[in-house]
Amino acid sequence: MIYDAIDDIRNSIKNWFKRNYKYLTTILLYFLYQTNFLISLMSSFGINFSKIPKTPRVFIFAINDLIYIIILLLMFKKDILSGVKDLKKHLSKRILLSLNCWLLGCIIMTTSSFIISLILKQNVSNNEELVRQSISIAPLYMLFTCSIIAPIFEEMIFRKSLYGLIKFKWIFILVSGLSFGLLHVIGSYTGPLDFLYVIPYGSIGCCFAYLLTKTNNITLPILVHMIHNTILVLMQIIGG
């Protein structure tokens, strides 16, 4: 009896990993990306990035980003292509739903950011300030990263992977939004009040998650996320 129970547990765990290995691999890839694993690996071979001129250094970082994205796109090739077919088949409905979700997210994000800025007496979040500084230093690289790399990576982990791991719709939406919001706060954390910015970032994350649950099409939130980030980066580049 005990051995049978142990075998059942072992088989259940094995089957769970088989079903979810792509989502778990995505989380691992994101961890490696965030910790600059490939860059650190190259540094261990004696490459000093601080001595490399700006242009080739930025190019190396762009190649590093592309490697991760290519792996992800190959892993989820069927999902991406299926999403494109769905988008072609229901184009007008998908555009309308995407627009509604995006506008709702933007309204909540903008309103909550304004209220938080009044409370903290600062114009933008620390994360936003760091992004603006990076844009002023390397605008083309940041346009590439924010408009292509980040949307694909973030949607694959915070939407596609979490949706695959969490089977309950509204729990998934809340966890997706919360984790997405925390990502944009923890990296530039200076104090407890910074966690207030989880609300604006999390709200747009929840809207992207809701969009996925309504369509089961990961391509859609990726595209909306790309458009959203591209608009913001271009506004910063043009407006200075």
How would you label these PLM feature ranges?
Residues 3-29, 53-58, 80-111, 167-168, ...:
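Interfacial transmembrane-helix boundary/kink motif in multi-pass membrane proteins
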Residues 13-17, 24-28, 59-73, 92-96, ...:
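Alpha-helical hydrophobic membrane-insertion segments
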